[in-house]
From Swiss-Prot:
GO terms for molecular function: protein methyltransferase activity; protein-lysine N-methyltransferase activity. CDD domains: AdoMet_MTases. It is found in: Cytoplasm. Belongs to the methyltransferase superfamily. PrmA family. This is Ribosomal protein L11 methyltransferase. GO terms for biological process: methylation. InterPro entries: Ribosomal_L11_MeTrfase_PrmA, Ribosomal_PrmA_MeTrfase, SAM-dependent_MTases_sf. Its main location: cytoplasm. HAMAP family: Methyltr_PrmA (MF_00735).
Length: 295
């Protein structure tokens, strides 16, 4: 007997931030197993969002959901079709080649055996492409982490806004030390913890749900001598003051998730709290910053 086809809904959206927002809504609405949600960036900067269903969805209801979360213009791109039954996540990721970043290589399970043995392998098999290494912000953070590790071995690391957990996993693999990771989004907390276990650093990476630095875990675990935060420009600016309070003297901070034209404002916010910029990487229109706390 032939397996039943998979029902697919897909639409396009104009930015990573907008894609994150709508994917957050979709993953909250659908129970795990009811629908699988994926988002991938195209070469032109647009993001394709797809949902796969075992049973045909209510198209009118789903269109209304997309209108409410992304607007009429985005909903106009919504299309429905059926595809042959297969491991569609694996198929989607087959076009994503391993991404080298210094000593690190981020890859999917389909490329597990293609990575050189002298590299620190980070396997990310998430339903979402945020933080798989194929975005310039993730690669920039990994390159700056590699740079930091050439001259120091941080002993207390925080990955703020961990997403898939890729940065926390990288730090844990390189340092063989405990790393605290946090995210505001419950599905991201779950995915990051799962990825930590997949990469055999689950005993080093502790993932918590938190908004900014509000959770008491940060005060208990700090001060940190390395913080990684790959989020967005506005949250980064607002977090400058609380982050500075949780840093050890001389701590390094790696920031990304900001467009290149947004970097000066972010740098200014952190300079006002006693952090000086050391390096600035620009990849595909995105900036990644390395700063140091003076004192």
């Amino acid at each position: 007997m032939q397996p039943s086809p998979t029902h697919r809904a897909s639409f396009s959206i104009g930015s990573e931030a907008a894609a994150r927002r709508v994917v957050d809504v979709l993953t909250e609405v659908f129970f795990e197993g009811d629908a699988a949600v994926a988002a991938f960036e195209r070469p032109d900067g647009q993001w394709d969002v797809t949902l796969h269903f075992a049973d045909a969805p209510d198209q009118a209801w789903l269109r209304e959901l997309v209108v409410n979360s992304a607007g009429n213009e985005i909903a106009d791109t919504l299309a429905f079709d059926t595809v042959e039954a297969k491991d569609w996540v694996k198929a989607s990721l087959e076009d994503l080649v391993p991404v080298p970043a210094g000593r690190f290589v981020v890859h999917g399970s389909h490329d597990r055996d293609r990575v050189a043995p002298n590299k620190l392998k980070i396997e990310i098999e998430a339903a979402l492409a945020f933080g798989t290494g194929h975005h310039g912000t993730t690669r920039g953070c990994l390159l700056l982490l590699d740079h930091v590790l050439k001259s120091s071995r941080p002993s207390n690391v925080l990955d703020l806004g961990t997403g898939t957990g890729v940065l926390a996993i990288a730090a844990a693999k390189a340092l063989h030390r405990a790393v605290l990771a946090s995210d505001i989004d419950p599905p991201s907390v779950r995915v990051a913890a799962e990825n930590g276990r997949l990469n055999e650093v689950g005993h080093h990476v502790r993932v918590i749900r938190a908004t900014g630095f509000a959770a008491p875990d940060f005060a208990r675990a700090g001060p940190f001598d390395l913080v990684l935060a790959n989020i967005l420009a506005n949250p980064l600016r607002h977090l400058a003051s609380p982050m500075a309070r949780h840093l050890a003297p001389g701590a390094r901070v790696i920031l990304s998730g900001l467009l290149t034209h947004q970097a000066p404002a972010v740098i200014a916010a952190y300079r006002a709290r006693g952090l000086v910029p050391l390096r600035h990487l620009r990849i595909e229109g995105w900036s990644s910053l390395l700063l140091r706390k003076v004192g």
